[in-house]
Structures are given as structure tokens and as C-alpha cells.
């Protein structure tokens, strides 16, 4: 599969999926944030948290929520003269999904329709915010994501001029802050690693979800600018039986390195083992999706893999997300628009470099490499 195929058909398909989600959401939106209540009445405000209860991100979600609760308890459950009520909402009910679009939309609508809502924490990862953000933005509600890296939420992805963030903001006002890195940040680090190792030809394997497809397009575009070439790209569609053919197709192009882009699942270890069998010793790189399963233990062969992911551990990311919201409420009080303005200003305190390097430890489990 050529570079043009990734950037064109694959990325175009993911864009279509995102647009379809946004169109479906748009049909449920009201007439805009100006029609919504702007000021919290009474002495209690609600912060909603949308996270998976099942699936690959469930354990990460539990840590994120623990961090959110810790930050809230440290403030005595109060901010801006308000008592803060915390509501956790499930973003998935299926064990084989990272997130469920219908549930994410339902969560966002519940928060947007609540006159006592002051902020929405979500989504956790892998592009789910593309569904919830238009809804919360239409209500003028602050949304803070602990970990969703979808680049187009805040900037135009390279090579995709029609995929900018404006489609997520029906009010034409930004109401979103993210705590972790963008997928483009990860793409830049992956390409920098390839460049530093003089791996001018590389292969890609990515999953069929929005996360993998969009990230693949960004890696290819950034690599092209750096003078590198994607000599092979293979889409993994969740069928373990297809893995040997994918590994052989990658090996046929004799890449200097292979980059794995996708969310960890039952095919992750078989895929890495198959690639190692076909390309023994060839450098392996991965994005943060491979970190989704903390219990993942790699065998000796592919344990040379390096991954780039969020610098903050999940519990700390949840803590920082809630802390930012509470600080914004302390400044903005009962007024949603003032809370949003405060959060956008306070987000400048977040570190610019939010990406860390991960390598498998002696047990084959990924651990952050200390600088």
C-alpha cells in the first residue's frame, strides 16, 4: 500500500467516520450556547466524568477517576463558592470496545442538559472526544480531556486541510482543554526516532479505528517532510488469522524499522511476534495505543520495541484535569463562560513536552524511561 493510499483513502475514511459522527451529533444539538443557562443557580455544581467501564482502557480509566477524586477531595469538594458534586458516566458497555459512540453522546447530552453542570471531564482516549465535544461546546460547557490525543480537536492535522477543529465547535468558541499530548506530538517523536537511527525506510501497521488511521496519516506526512519513506503500510482489521500475511507483506519491502499504530488488544502480541519472526532484529516502534493494556507482557523477541506515550501516568492525568477545572471554577464561579475563559488561560501552565519514551521492563511490561 503506498503513502498516497494511507494519506488519501485511509485518512479519508477516518475523516468520513468522524464527520458522520459529528453530523449525527449535530442533528441533536440545540440552537447554540447563547440559549443555554449561563449561570449556576443554587449552591451546588456538577462535574461529569465520562470514562470506559469495560474494554482495554477500563483499568486506565479507574486510575484516571481515582486522580480526579483525589483532586476533588483535596479541595473539600468545593470551588468558587460552590459545593461540587461528582458524577461518573460509562463511555462503553462492551468489553471489546475502547469507547461506544452512542454512550459518549448520551453522556455529553446528560451534562449539557444539566443546568447545574459546570464542567465535563472526557473523553479518555482514541478519538471519542470527536463525538462529545460538539455537544458540550453547544452548551458552552467546559470540557477537559485527561488523555484524548486526536490532533484535529485543537489544530489542523498535517496533510489534511479540510479536517480542522472548527467542526467540533458549533458556537465558534473554544471550550476544550487537553492534559496529555496530541497524536501529532507522538508522530513527531516517532519520526525523530526513525531519523536519529537513520531508518530511512519504514513499514507501518495500523488498526481500522479512527485513532490508528489518523495517526498513520500524520506519521507518513511528517516522515515525508523529514526525507523518510513509508515503503509498506498494512491495516490490521482485528482478524488474528490475517497477521501472518501482514507480517510477510511488511517483510517483503525490507524496511529499516516497523512502526505499530493501534490500540492494544488480543492481536498485539501475535502481531509483534509475527513481525519479529519475519524481520528479526529490525527496530520496532509504537504509539501510545500499545500502552492501553498495562498487563500486556511481551515475549523476549519483540521486547526491543520502544513506544511513545503520555508523560503523565493516568492517575496524575486525572488529578491535573480535575485540578484545572477546580481552579477555573474558583476564578469563574457560577458563570460557565468565565469558567471556560479561566480554564483556557490556566492551560498555559501545562508543560509543552507531554510525551515520554516507554520500554518493556524485565517482565515484558512497558515502563516509562526516566530522563
Regions found by a protein language model. Give the residues of each.
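Beta-alpha junction/loop-to-helix N-cap segments that form part of ligand/metal-binding clefts
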Residues: 35, 59-63, 78-162, 236-241, ...
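Extracytoplasmic ligand/sensor domains, especially the bilobed periplasmic-binding protein
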Residues: 117-232, 282-306
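Bacterial signal peptide processing site
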Residues: 29-32
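Extracytoplasmic "Venus flytrap"
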Residues: 36-69, 79, 89-99, 208, ...
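Bacterial N-terminal signal peptides that target proteins for export
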Residues: 2-18
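Segments of small-molecule ligand-sensing domains
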Residues: 315-370
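Extracellular/periplasmic periplasmic-binding protein-like sensory domains
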Residues: 268-320, 330-333, 365-368
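C-terminal motif of bacterial Sec signal peptides marking the signal peptidase cleavage site
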Residues: 25-27
Amino acid at each position: 500500500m503506498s503513502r498516497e493510499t494511507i494519506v488519501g483513502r485511509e485518512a479519508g475514511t477516518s475523516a468520513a467516520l468522524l464527520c458522520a459522527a459529528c453530523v449525527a451529533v449535530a442533528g441533536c444539538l440545540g440552537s447554540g450556547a447563547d440559549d443555554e443557562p449561563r449561570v449556576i443557580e443554587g449552591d451546588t455544581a456538577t462535574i461529569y466524568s465520562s470514562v470506559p467501564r469495560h474494554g482495554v482502557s477500563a483499568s486506565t480509566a479507574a486510575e484516571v477517576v481515582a486522580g480526579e477524586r483525589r483532586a476533588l477531595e483535596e479541595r473539600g469538594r468545593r470551588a468558587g463558592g460552590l459545593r461540587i458534586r461528582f458524577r461518573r458516566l460509562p463511555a462503553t458497555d462492551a468489553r471489546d470496545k475502547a469507547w461506544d459512540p452512542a454512550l459518549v453522546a448520551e453522556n455529553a447530552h446528560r451534562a449539557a442538559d444539566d443546568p447545574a453542570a459546570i464542567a465535563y471531564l472526557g473523553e479518555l482516549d482514541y478519538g471519542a472526544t470527536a463525538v462529545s465535544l460538539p455537544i458540550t461546546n453547544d452548551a458552552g460547557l467546559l470540557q477537559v480531556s485527561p488523555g484524548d490525543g486526536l490532533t484535529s480537536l485543537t489544530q489542523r492535522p498535517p496533510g489534511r486541510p479540510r479536517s480542522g477543529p472548527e467542526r467540533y465547535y458549533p458556537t465558534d468558541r473554544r471550550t476544550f482543554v487537553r492534559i496529555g499530548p496530541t497524536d501529532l506530538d507522538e508522530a513527531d517523536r516517532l519520526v525523530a526516532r526513525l531519523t536519529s537511527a537513520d531508518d530511512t525506510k519504514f513499514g507501518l501497521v495500523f488498526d481500522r479505528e479512527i485513532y490508528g488511521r489518523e495517526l498513520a496519516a500524520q506519521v507518513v506526512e511528517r516522515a515525508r517532510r523529514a526525507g523518510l519513506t513509508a515503503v509498506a503500510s498494512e491495516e490490521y482489521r482485528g482478524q488474528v488469522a490475517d497477521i501472518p500475511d501482514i507480517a510477510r507483506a511488511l517483510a517483503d519491502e525490507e524496511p529499516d524499522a516497523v512502526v505499530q499504530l493501534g490500540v492494544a488488544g488480543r492481536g498485539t502480541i501475535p502481531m509483534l511476534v509475527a513481525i519479529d519472526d519475519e524481520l528479526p532484529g529490525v527496530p520496532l516502534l509504537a504509539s501510545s495505543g500499545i500502552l492501553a493494556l498495562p498487563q500486556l507482557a511481551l515475549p523476549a523477541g519483540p521486547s526491543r520495541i520502544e513506544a511513545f506515550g503520555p508523560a503523565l501516568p493516568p492517575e496524575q492525568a486525572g488529578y491535573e484535569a480535575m485540578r484545572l477545572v477546580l481552579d477555573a471554577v474558583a476564578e469563574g464561579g457560577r458563570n460557565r463562560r468565565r469558567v471556560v475563559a479561566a480554564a483556557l488561560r490556566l492551560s498555559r501552565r501545562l508543560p509543552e513536552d507531554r510525551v515520554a519514551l516507554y520500554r518493556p521492563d524485565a517482565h515484558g511490561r512497558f515502563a516509562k524511561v526516566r530522563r
